[in-house]
Amino acid sequence: MPFTRILAVFVVVAAGLSGRIESASESASPARTDIEQQQAPSWSKDDLNFFLHGSMSTEVVPESVLRAFIKTYPDLFPSSDLSHLGLILDKDFGWPIGLSRKNVQHLGGMPAVGINCASCHVAQISSISRPQPIQILGVTGHFDVESFFGSVLVATFKTSDPENMKRFLRNYVSDTGKVHGDHAETAVSSAWKKQEEKIVAAMKTDPFGGKDVAPGELHKIEPAEVKLDIKSLEKGDVDLAARVHSMLKLFHNMRTTLHVPDKPPDKVPPASGPGRNDAFGLLSASLLNMPQPYSPIKFGLVWNVDKRIWVHWDGNTKSPIARNLLASLGLGAPMHGKRGDLIFADVKRQTDLSEKIAPPKYPFSLDNDAAKRGAPLFANNCNSCHGGPESDTRLHAVAEVGTDPHRAEMFTQKLADGFNKFLVELESEGYQAPKEYGVRSTGKYWAATLSGVWARSPYLHNGSVRTMHELLTSPDQRAKTFHRGSRVFDEKEMGYTDDGAYVLDTAGSGNSNSGHDYGTKLSENEKRDLIEYLKTL
């Protein structure tokens, strides 16, 4: 069925594949650090706040619904603050960095949350020598984005069961009415008992809320239809069966904006884990209805983007606004035919800000003598691919590099044509269709400039090599599995420590750690010198 592929990726959590991630320190709103100021010196405080929490029109779940889900399904949401997803807490905002808030009409006018660039491109790291977390912009983050959306979607399906709906409503009333849980439970249970037969019949007739609307279309939901307060329940002024049906329609709208059908999939693919997803696989399925083989990649790096012509691991996109429009429309901004329902100015502002982020300077101690010895090693082993002009000479065939071929092979010319056609036909207020195509297929991998390479762990496009020292090790001697989720930086090995709940198995589809054997024949001392030099870039 259409779009089953994208749903399958999102609901990996349903198969118990999601693991708890090491959480950040529970601080208030992060103060602007020296490293952030170095990375984005032209940003104002408002710019920083907008990058961290500004809307991209992806708000997909009402806050009150999300809080009720968190209380109702602790198996899906092990932490109430979402820290289990690898997000950075921000108590002043109320939700972690990378989450936005906006009132959404098709969600009953309620304040809802979605994600923006910062959810995937901001991270905190520490080390044994410097335990205080350092916040970095534009880096590969630790967010388990699949588990976030998977948990929300699975919760909508689970709440189509009457008993689960009753539990959900108790928590929903408790949150929206700001009343004690026991008080809400008594009120909901009493009202439910009076209308139970009617409620169950309504849920059986339309369990997923999509009966009265065409596939892919949204219900119009007025605020009063999803309002549920303790006083009205106790007075008997509420048609609870009607409220339940409105909630099911709300869940339908949530799924529809994520291009997910009102039916769970029969099977799911493997979980990509923190800091990774199958980005173009999701977008090709959701926006083009062109499902692709599973091809996990780590989140890209948003540094010096203004100096690049083509971006992404295969150099397939040259339009900055296009890539963020695709992300917004794939992750919650509604589509009505060819019209994208989003605030273009907000997406453009996020895009413009991301263009101004510089790579972070190495924040830990450095062996300058070793770095000097490493400079010629870099020139002889790395610079021929990773240096020089930003041109297509940076593209290298999979056979030449030897790394996992899935990502390069999946982005075909047919797929590029599909995205170009989509962007030309897209309508949205303020958006002007490109005069020339900005998406292409290369079938190769791009050798990016290595500025900030110290912070790019895990390495390779699919994040299959944990540290730089291991990347300089012969592929057949690299670890076959390692853990993801740690925020502790190993200064000696140059990468995150082998900790966290998620296990990356390099034998899995798209996860190969083969290839890129450059520098593997250096002596151990030479490797250490080269690593020290790389920290200076």
Label for each model-derived stretch:
Residues 25-537:
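Periplasmic c-type cytochrome electron-transfer domains
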